[in-house]
């Protein structure tokens, strides 16, 4: 456990020594701070100079990582050891993008051979749709693709397809359906022509309630309009491991793409779950996405901790969570294409590390994953940055931006990028009472009025942030960015001694929903309901009589 590691008391002592120090003083005394706390990897760079740390902090954090045998645990994951201890599974999302030739054997299975076999089938299918060779039941080309999934079967593909829209096939439109609220599926179907629509149903078991409900609604809509169930074979494909259920649905087994239990949903966009990505962007761009992630994997495995991006970000996060007692972390991308990135990271981070039980089954006496949230930074400035600047919470921020200007939008990117740098500087530097008072006097306010108002114009500063810069939003850079956050999450899970690869927390609500659904549908359930739940069930039933 973290609190039992030999470096932990050293970090506690160090925290007491520097907790009142201000970053603006460090910057004024150390002209090399920005260059020393800057790491470049391929087309991605991290400026972590605006954090409440110094060389001693970093030295102790790296020592903490070594106390946890982080290097050995990284190697264990890549080798396919069953580090998902509660489910007795390997964790091999990295194998999905591996360019190595050294085979990984898992329970007599050749992992890379299996992965590449599925990728080959995905490429052939993608090519057939993009080229127009695969036609619908009236011999029309496919123009619209609807991905039906939820959680990891939705968020990753949605995020990547949105981020890389500039690389998409000009004929194809992507639609994502995840919410079991019928409004979403009906709104999507309303726009579509069944003769030119391809549905991808993504569910490992092919029994996920939300996904199957939406898929059956899509199936009913399609059959009613096409006039014959046999046409399903040309318009529905599945990403699943349940061949029998897929065939019962009407999908040809040759149009089923498998994935494996060594890949968790939130880590699965690199697998057949990414079929929608490959069709939309093409195999060349999908390969570049995989390669970018692979290069980050190699960096994570091989770079020393001192220049290792996932290690640095993971340890800096631990520093705030476990010593500054920060409860929250903000993801602020300054790019319209990255608008779904915060909610993707929400799932990745909170579903992985939102745990309170150690790998040994003991209750953990310290904080783990913070609440992760975010929005596009430029919009957020006009919404909740007020709280970040002058509120009572310490909320570390990841600013994410690209250097590449958008064509045909002169001046826009300079304004956008200036705000990234200005906000990060403002959070670090702040504004003193004396500065605020002087500004108000210079604007002509009376001295007494300026004295009172100046209190409201003070920015304490010392608010930490990372700045992640991509040269441009490209397939390879997106691959590297996602893999960076995957590995950051892994680092923190190791430090906290938790299993980052199960998600038992999603199960209880699903179990309890079963008897409630029976009651709502007019069937009697033997389940016991608390008085509040019972009252609300009756309220619903009475309204819908």
Swiss-Prot record:
GO MF annotation list: carbohydrate derivative binding; glucose-6-phosphate isomerase activity; monosaccharide binding
Catalytic activity: alpha-D-glucose 6-phosphate = beta-D-fructose 6-phosphate
Pathways involved: Carbohydrate biosynthesis; gluconeogenesis; Carbohydrate degradation; glycolysis; D-glyceraldehyde 3-phosphate and glycerone phosphate from D-glucose: step 2/4
E.C. no: 5.3.1.9
InterPro entries recorded: G6P_Isomerase, G6P_Isomerase_C, Phosphoglucose_isomerase_CS, SIS_dom_sf, SIS_PGI_1, SIS_PGI_2
List of catalytic residues: 351 (proton donor), 382, 510
Keyword Cytoplasm attached: yes
Keyword terms of this UniProt record: Cytoplasm, Gluconeogenesis, Glycolysis, Isomerase
Localization in the cell: Cytoplasm
GO cellular component, one term: cytosol
Single GO BP term: glucose 6-phosphate metabolic process
Main location: cytoplasm
Alphabetized NCBIfam families for the sequence: PRK00179.1
Entry similarity comment: Belongs to the GPI family.
Its biological purpose: Catalyzes the reversible isomerization of glucose-6-phosphate to fructose-6-phosphate.
Protein name as annotated: Glucose-6-phosphate isomerase
Source species: Helicobacter acinonychis (strain Sheeba)
């Amino acid at each position: 456990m973290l609190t039992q590691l030999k470096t932990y008391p050293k970090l506690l002592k160090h925290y007491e020594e520097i907790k009142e120090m201000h970053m603006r003083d460090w910057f004024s005394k150390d002209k090399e701070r920005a260059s020393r706390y800057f790491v470049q990897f391929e087309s991605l760079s991290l400026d972590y100079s605006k954090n409440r740390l110094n060389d001693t902090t970093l030295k102790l954090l790296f020592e903490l990582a070594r106390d946890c045998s982080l290097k050995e645990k990284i190697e264990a994951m890549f080798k396919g050891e069953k580090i998902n201890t509660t489910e007795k599974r390997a964790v091999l999302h990295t194998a999905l993008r591996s360019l190595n030739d050294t085979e990984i054997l898992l329970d007599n299975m050749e992992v890379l051979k299996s992965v590449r076999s599925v990728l080959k089938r995905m490429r052939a299918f993608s090519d057939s749709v993009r080229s127009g060779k695969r036609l619908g039941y009236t011999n029309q080309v496919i123009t619209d693709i609807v991905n039906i999934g939820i959680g990891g079967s939705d968020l990753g593909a949605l995020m990547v397809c949105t981020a890389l829209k500039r690389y998409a096939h000009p004929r194809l439109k992507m639609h994502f359906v995840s919410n079991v609220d019928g409004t979403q599926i009906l709104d999507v179907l309303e726009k579509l022509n069944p003769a030119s629509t391809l549905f991808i149903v993504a569910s490992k078991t092919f029994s996920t309630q939300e996904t199957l409900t939406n898929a059956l609604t899509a199936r009913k809509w399609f059959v009613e309009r096409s006039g014959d169930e046999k046409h399903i074979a040309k318009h529905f494909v599945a990403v699943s491991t349940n061949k029998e259920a897929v065939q019962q649905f009407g999908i040809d087994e040759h149009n089923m793409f498998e994935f494996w239990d060594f890949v968790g949903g939130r880590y699965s966009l690199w697998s057949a779950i990414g079929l929608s990505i490959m069709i939309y962007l093409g195999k060349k761009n999908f390969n570049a996405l995989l390669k970018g992630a692979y290069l980050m994997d190699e960096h994570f495995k091989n770079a020393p901790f001192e220049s290792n991006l996932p290690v640095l970000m993971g340890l800096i996060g631990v520093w705030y969570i476990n010593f500054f007692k920060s409860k929250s972390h903000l993801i602020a991308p300054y790019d319209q294409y990255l608008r779904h990135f915060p909610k993707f990271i929400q799932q990745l981070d909170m579903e992985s590390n939102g745990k309170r039980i150690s790998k040994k089954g003991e209750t953990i006496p310290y904080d783990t994953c913070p609440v992760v949230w975010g929005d596009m930074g430029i919009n957020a400035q006009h919404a909740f940055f007020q709280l970040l600047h002058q509120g009572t919470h310490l909320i570390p921020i990841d600013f994410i931006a690209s250097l590449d200007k958008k064509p045909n939008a002169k001046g826009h990117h300079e304004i956008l990028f200036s705000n990234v740098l200005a906000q990060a500087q403002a959070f670090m530097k702040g504004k003193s009472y004396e500065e605020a008072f002087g500004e108000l006097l210079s604007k002509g306010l009376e001295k007494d009025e300026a004295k009172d108002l100046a209190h409201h114009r003070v920015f304490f500063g010392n608010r930490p942030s990372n700045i992640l810069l991509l040269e441009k939003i490209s397939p390879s850079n997106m691959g590297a960015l996602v893999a960076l956050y995957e590995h950051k999450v892994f680092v923190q899970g190791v430090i906290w001694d938790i299993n980052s690869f199960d998600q038992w927390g999603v199960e209880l609500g699903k179990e309890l929903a079963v008897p409630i659904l029976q009651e709502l549908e007019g069937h009697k359930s033997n389940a016991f309901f608390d008085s509040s739940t019972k009252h609300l069930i009756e309220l619903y039933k009475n309204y819908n009589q």
